[in-house]
Amino acid sequence: GATVFGSMIRDSYIHYMMSYGGEDFIDVDTGKCNFNSQSFMDMLEYAKTLPREDSRDDGVDYDYYENQYRENRTLLYDLNISNLKDCMYQIKGYMGEEVSFVGFPTSDSNGSVLSAGNVFFALSAKSENMEGAWQFARQFLTPEYQTSEELYNMPVLKSAFLDKAQEATQRPYWTDENGNREYYDDTWTVNGETVILEPFTQEEVDRICQFIYTVDRTAYYNEEIINIIKEEAEAFFADQKSVQEVVDIIQSRAQIYVDENR
């Protein structure tokens, strides 16, 4: 039968659970924790059904792994939309059909998040050089930078974002020494056969953009909190403590940690 997350193990699920749903359990504004909730208990109950370690050996059948979504063996795919071009490979390559953007299971059924990527900046409210700091950060928000080739990931300037999205409706090309465009096709391998991936239609691009506009969560990540969860959940996974006992301990430890570090 089909699995929800494929070969995902417990630790990976806990990382996803906090990255996508961490705001359900920690209010980043007030510092109030909510780990002794029914939704968190439900997530630990599900995590218990997952394997502790990946049972696959080193000789993984690459085609078998790549085709798990096309063959309906795995239901959910962790789609990372850094730009619509890469998104096309994931949707038309891995999935091979129209998809639904459902997000990770969260309390408000809206478990998709915005991530700042590898580089992000914060301006200290106590800075003595706020204007200089702002001018430095501002350069990355200007139309010149947002439309430049330096920016590989998704632009935050809407006009630049829409222009970039439009590229996903066009066939890829490279430019020869005479400045002429040489077009080619994106391809994917399915069961040893090469298939052509057609560019997105305008309707498909519009649908993806509309989904992106609805995302209003940011990814949550705190290694200390995740370690607390993993450490204490082991007793539940090993049937040494009930899920209620474990979440009460997690709630206490997490709240102390948050209070001490605010």
Residues of each region from the PLM?
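Extracytoplasmic/periplasmic solute-binding protein
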Residues: 1-33, 72-76
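Glycine-centered hinge/linker elements that transmit conformational signals in sensory
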Residues: 29-62, 99-100, 104
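Conserved N-terminal structural module of periplasmic/extracytoplasmic solute-binding proteins
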Residues: 195, 217-219, 231, 240-262
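Short helices/loops that flank or line small-molecule/ion binding pockets
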Residues: 62-77, 82, 89, 231, ...
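Long, aromatic- and glycine/proline-rich binding clefts that accommodate carbohydrate-like moieties
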Residues: 102, 151-235
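Non-transmembrane alpha-helical segments in soluble domains
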Residues: 41-51, 66, 124, 133-142, ...
